[in-house]
C-alpha cells in the first residue's frame, strides 16, 4: 500500500453458465428472480457459485476418513457456519445434508426476503426499495444492501430505522406538507392518503 489505496479483490464472485441458451435453466433462473425480487441473473449466479464452493468443500471432506482430524475440524466449522446463517437445521448437522442444499435455502436468508416475510414491506420489490433507501436496520446498524445475509440470531432484530419516517423518525415530505397545510390553511382541501 504505497499510495494509500485499498487493494481491490480480483477474484470473480460468480461464474457464467457454460451453455447460455439452455431453456430449462433460463426458465428456472427467471422464476427465481421473480420470486425473490432479484435485479439480474448475476445475483442468481453469485449464490449458485457460493453454494457450489460449499458443496465442493463438503464433498472433499466426505472422501476423508470419519476420524480424520481435517474432516472433524473443517467439517464442524463448515456446519457451524451454515447453521449460524440459518441455511442448515441444527438437527441435520451432517456433511451429507450439505450436499442437499439448494439455492433457495440461501436466497431465503437475504435481508430483502426477510423484510418481506416479516411484513415490513408490501411486496418483495418494496422490500428492496426500503432497504436501499436506508429504512431498515438490523440491531442498531442501518443496512442498505438487499443481499445482506441475515444470521439466525439477528433475524428477530430486523426493524425500521429510528430516523426513518416508518420507524417514528422525521415525517416524509408529503406528510410534512399536509401537516403544514392543515395548520396554516384551516382545512378546505381534502387530506391526501397517508401511508
UniProtKB/Swiss-Prot annotation:
Q: Which UniProt keywords apply?
A: Cytoplasm, Nucleus, Ribonucleoprotein, Ribosomal protein, RNA-binding, rRNA-binding
Q: List locations, semicolon-separated.
A: Cytoplasm; Nucleus, Nucleolus
Pfam families named in the record: Ribosomal_S4 (PF00163), S4 (PF01479)
Query: Boundaries of each S4 RNA-binding domain copy?
Result: 109-183
Q: Where is this region: Disordered?
A: 165-195
Q: Looking at the UniProt record for this protein, which Gene Ontology cellular component terms does it annotate, in alphabetical order?
A: cytoplasm; cytosol; cytosolic ribosome; cytosolic small ribosomal subunit; nucleolus; small-subunit processome
Q: Do the record's keywords include Transmembrane helix?
A: no
**Alphabetized Gene3D superfamilies for the sequence:** RNA-binding S4 domain
Primary site of residence = cytoplasm
GO terms (molecular function) for this protein are: rRNA binding; structural constituent of ribosome
**Where are the bilayer-spanning segments?**
none
Q: Name one GO biological process term.
A: cytoplasmic translation
Which InterPro entries does this entry report, sorted A to Z?
Ribosomal_uS4 (IPR022801), Ribosomal_uS4_CS (IPR018079), Ribosomal_uS4_euk/arc (IPR005710), Ribosomal_uS4_N (IPR001912), S4_RNA-bd (IPR002942), S4_RNA-bd_sf (IPR036986)
Assembly with partners or alone = Component of the small ribosomal subunit. Identified in a IGF2BP1-dependent mRNP granule complex containing untranslated mRNAs. Part of the small subunit (SSU) processome, composed of more than 70 proteins and the RNA chaperone small nucleolar RNA (snoRNA) U3.
Family label? Belongs to the universal ribosomal protein uS4 family.
- Any idea what job this protein has? Component of the small ribosomal subunit. The ribosome is a large ribonucleoprotein complex responsible for the synthesis of proteins in the cell. Part of the small subunit (SSU) processome, first precursor of the small eukaryotic ribosomal subunit. During the assembly of the SSU processome in the nucleolus, many ribosome biogenesis factors, an RNA chaperone and ribosomal proteins associate with the nascent pre-rRNA and work in concert to generate RNA folding, modifications, rearrangements and cleavage as well as targeted degradation of pre-ribosomal RNA by the RNA exosome.
From the Swiss-Prot or TrEMBL record, give the protein name.
Small ribosomal subunit protein uS4
Recorded source organism is Drosophila melanogaster
Amino acid at each position: 500500500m504505497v499510495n494509500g489505496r485499498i487493494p481491490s479483490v480480483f477474484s470473480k464472485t460468480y461464474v457464467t453458465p457454460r451453455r447460455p441458451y439452455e431453456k430449462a435453466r433460463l426458465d428456472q433462473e427467471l422464476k427465481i428472480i421473480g420470486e425473490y425480487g432479484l435485479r439480474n441473473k448475476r445475483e442468481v449466479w453469485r449464490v449458485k457459485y457460493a453454494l457450489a464452493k460449499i458443496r465442493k468443500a463438503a464433498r472433499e471432506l466426505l472422501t476423508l476418513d470419519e476420524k480424520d482430524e481435517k474432516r472433524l475440524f473443517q467439517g464442524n466449522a463448515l456446519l457451524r457456519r451454515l447453521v449460524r446463517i440459518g441455511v442448515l437445521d441444527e438437527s441435520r448437522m451432517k456433511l451429507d445434508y450439505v450436499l442437499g442444499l439448494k439455492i433457495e435455502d440461501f436466497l431465503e436468508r437475504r435481508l430483502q426476503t426477510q423484510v418481506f416475510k416479516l411484513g415490513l414491506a408490501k411486496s418483495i420489490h418494496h422490500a428492496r426499495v426500503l432497504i436501499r433507501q436506508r429504512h431498515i436496520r438490523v440491531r442498531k446498524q442501518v443496512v442498505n444492501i438487499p443481499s445482506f445475509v441475515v444470521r439466525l440470531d439477528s433475524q428477530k432484530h430486523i426493524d425500521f430505522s429510528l430516523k426513518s419516517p416508518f420507524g417514528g423518525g422525521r415525517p416524509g415530505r408529503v406528510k410534512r406538507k399536509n401537516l403544514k397545510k392543515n395548520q396554516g390553511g384551516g382545512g378546505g382541501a381534502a387530506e391526501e392518503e397517508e401511508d
